[in-house]
Amino acid sequence: MSEAEAPLITEEAAERGLASSGSRRLSDGAGGQGSRKYRRRSDALAYGDRYQKAAALVDLAEDGVGIPEDVLNDTRFGRAMSFYFVYLRLDWLWSLNLFALILLNFLEKPLWCRKDALQAYDQRDLYFLGQLPYFSKTESLIYEGLTLVILVMDIFCPLSYEGLNIFWRSTTNKLKIVLLFILACDILVFAFSSQPFRLAPYIRVVFLIMTIRELRMCAITLAGLIGTYLNVLALSLLFLLFASWLAYVTFEDTPQGKTIFSSYGVTLYQMFVLFTTSNNPDVWVHAYKIPRWYSLFFIVYVLLGVYFLTNLILAVIYDSFKEQFAKQLVQVDSIRKNILQKAFDLIDTNNRGYLDREQCISLLNELNKYRSLPKTSREDFELIFAELDRSGDFKVTSEEFADLCNTIAIKFQKEPPPSYLEKFPFYHSPLCGRLKSFVRSRMFEYIIVFVLLINLVAVIIETTLDIENSSSQETWQEVEFFLGWIYVAEMALKIFSLGFGAYWMEGQNKFDFVLTWTIFIGETLTFAFPSKLPFLSNGEWIRYLLLGRVLRLTRILLQVQRFRAFVATFFTLMSSLMPYLGIVFCVLCMYCSIGLQIFGGIVYAGNPTLEETDLFNNDYLLFNFNDYPSGMVTLFNLLVMGNWQVWMESYWQLTGTSWSLIYFVSFYLISILLLLNLIVAFVLEAFFAEMELEKGEEVDIQNPTSGGIKKRRSMRVRSKGTMVDILLHHMLSNELDGSQNS
């Protein structure tokens, strides 16, 4: 660090009661001897020696925490990083506020019924509204005001560590400020007047996309392929126009033409719906009744449109998608490389361009605080150094240093925080040692699996007796209550043996923790107050949670060789798919807000036009756009393409204008033809890529030669240490190489 930072660090160290600067500094080649130990990365970056700072930066880089490059090169780097970590520690608040913003869309009173409060509260059945409560105008303003204040803090907090110049260079920050201003104005207008239109529901979703990095990357990627998508859409439109004209001319004087293809516009609409196969074969039944060979026209149309053109569109779009997505990954990798280069420069104080053995060993020693590296001797550290020194000249260059960090991220887990019980002597007694060893053993796992199997049998029997209204049901409910205590004991033993930090690091344990406490508290209240709490006295909801607990049996599949790859691939794919599913959710939110503002309130009991629609005939009245929850469910039905033309044609009749078709057609083009097809293609390629990685691991295990290790390491050299990143980099290896070469 530069000398300009010394007074600042000394002042803050005195305030926090830290050791003097003499204990913080490390002499060259000392490898951390005599320096103060920091368990937190923020303290290490602000007050640590150069090895401690470098180790904290390496850990940040491998965790995917992106620090602006200008902040890395700032002379007041230590102070900036202390503010940066304060901002990161408040991430739970920023995330909770984003959730609150989206939740507000579901709890807001629909704009179309604000003039008459009775419509929303006392006549829910008349308008087929949902069961969620609505905020009053005052409650909405208070809620929006609180979320706005937190949003302002979230947006402007980066000023503390970036500074005004760096902050204002970011296009994302500028856009956030503009949207924040528009949102504040919208709230003010809403406070003093009742307008039928608001921008706030849309801006909330945009903030969600811009704040979550994965969603932002997906949105930028999709924006980059708009040009390609419009080109293939133009080709599809030409095909549809020509096929519709051919159908209109061919069936002009037939019953098909007189009933279904009565005009070119109607023919175009029907052929578009047939392109989605939603009205097949209803649309050409009349033509099929006269000469059967007329069916050839529609068969050829479906084959060309659905099985050729649609797949061609998917292939072109997915190829462009991979190129755009590779560009985003290159940017993420660039941030990681910049952080690692900063760590390299901190150690290479003499600007030699390489690190020697002593420096690498000192860094590995400091990394023990963040990664569960082997607690071994200096000789073992030298073996790690020798493995990474590919040139054999006892010098590690910046490129080899990146391989070092990548290997650490892949091979070693995060070091969990020590248990709070470590300070008590009894925790280190022989009896506690045997108990902890038993909890960590496979025998303990087998016992829990056996209890789960008993639980499954008990749930099945209790459910069967409930259906038969048998009095023996109460006995099995008591059995389930007893099993609940066993799960609580299991959770307590694991936390005691591992420590809560190590216990919470595993996703399976998080699932068990939440589920166990929810079921246990619910069962306890049900047995303690069977009549005072009507909601809890109904055991149905607890039974569903008990069935959820049986999902832990999927752990057994991981022990079977033939199933392990498939189960592991499933969980990896679920993690990698979350950003894309999040984008689909955001699109649904946008279209739901639009649907509420243009279709809200037109579906109600007693509407004479409604009774003439297929919406009424099919008993789809609950699937409407009268409030946000109902609109989201309706859009989900449209997303799965289940009779989606029913809503399109019904709202065409209800509004009396064909302009309403734009809403449904655009939703199909964006959500289904683009997003869902991309997700399907992504899942297919990701599955094959993950299977290749699994086979590669098996080969390396069976043939642990240096060549096999080198091949495996080179396959993951770009990754950030997580399975999702490894998978993405393997999938897009060709595109990434092309982006870097260009």
Swiss-Prot record:
The chain crosses the membrane at residues 83-103, 141-161, 177-197, 205-226, 227-247, 297-317, 447-467, 481-501, 511-531, 541-558, 583-603, 664-684. InterPro entries: EF-hand-dom_pair (IPR011992), EF_hand_dom (IPR002048), Ion_trans_dom (IPR005821), TPC1_plant (IPR044581), Volt_channel_dom_sf (IPR027359). SMART domains: EFh. SUPFAM superfamilies: EF-hand, Voltage-gated potassium channels. One of its GO terms (molecular function) is voltage-gated calcium channel activity. Residues 259-273, 628-642 dip into the membrane without crossing it. Residues 104-140, 198-204, 248-258, 274-296, 468-480, 532-540, 604-627, 643-663 are extracellular. GO terms for cellular component: monoatomic ion channel complex; plant-type vacuole; vacuolar membrane. Glycans are attached at residue 469. Residues 1-82, 162-176, 318-446, 502-510, 559-582, 685-742 are cytoplasmic. Its main location: membrane. The keyword Ion transport applies. Induction: By high salinity, PEG, cold shock, and abscisic acid (ABA). GO terms for biological process: calcium ion transport; defense response. Homodimer. PANTHER family: TWO PORE CALCIUM CHANNEL PROTEIN 1 (PTHR46988:SF2). Belongs to the calcium channel alpha-1 subunit (TC 1.A.1.11) family. Two pore calcium channel subfamily. This is Two pore calcium channel protein 1. It comes from Triticum aestivum (Wheat).
